[in-house]
Amino acid sequence: MKVNNLLEEYYLSFEYNNLREETKAQYKYFLGIVCSTNIVSSKKLGSYKLSDLTTKLAKLSYNKWCERGVSFANHLMSVIRVLLNYGINMEHCNVNPFSNIKKRVVTHRKVVWKKEDVIRFLDTAYSDFKTRSIGLIAQMAYEWCQRLGDMRLLKWDNLDLEEKRMYLQQSKRRAEVFLPISDELNEMLLQQKNDYGFQEYVAPRPRPFRGSYKPYSLVKLPILARKVMNSAGLSNELRLSDLRRT
């Protein structure tokens, strides 16, 4: 059995389908990158037989992923370990060579946004209808100190605009939080609901996909946010994910 074959089986498994929708999307994204990784002689990792996977190959793969960032590489390492552990449980393979590779330590970022940076970003994002949802995601993450992933998937059911409060069960810690909505943010949300209240997401992509409005993906959000940041003349050191620490 090849890695790609195991991946197809895993997507049909109880283990995968019992995950949260957001987690499933993340797994599919990262596992797709893992299986398309070229290591030796342009051969993709997904085309290797499970019996041909070695610790050396795992190490070379991880080193290549680290070229795109240690945190990114560690995400890939986590999902390939999950996949191969599933393979062991199903008796498709006997060992998980990626379990032998020590992850590198991620250096924690200390970059924060200045208030004037936030204002410039929001002014730029809100000046164009196409980027208004990106501005809302950023403003909500900033005001409530919440993860971008949670704000990206926030639904109208989470909001009480009359009482100006938000309810959320955090995706990572599973904690329930109730937070006030400022007058400025509430005004933007009312405007957003007037335009997008017919569907479930607070800050969807501006155009429908296959007949329905979808949230921004984990990949697209930072890319499109970077374009807004460049238009606003902000430093390349800033990341949208830094907002919750600001």
Spans of model-derived segments:
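Active-site/catalytic core of tyrosine-dependent DNA strand-transfer enzymes
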Residues: 182-235
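Basic, Lys/Arg- and aromatic-enriched nucleic-acid-binding interface segment
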Residues: 74, 89, 93, 99-148, ...
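C-terminal catalytic core of tyrosine-transesterase DNA break-rejoin enzymes
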Residues: 71, 89-90, 139, 143, ...
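Conserved tyrosine-mediated DNA breakage-rejoining catalytic core shared by Y-recombinases
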Residues: 108, 117, 144, 153-194
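N-terminal core-binding DNA-recognition domain of tyrosine recombinases/integrases
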Residues: 8-22, 31-109, 123-125
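Short basic/aromatic active-site micro-motif
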Residues: 133-135, 235-246
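Short functional hotspots where side chains directly engage DNA or cofactors
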Residues: 99-100, 163-169, 203, 239-242
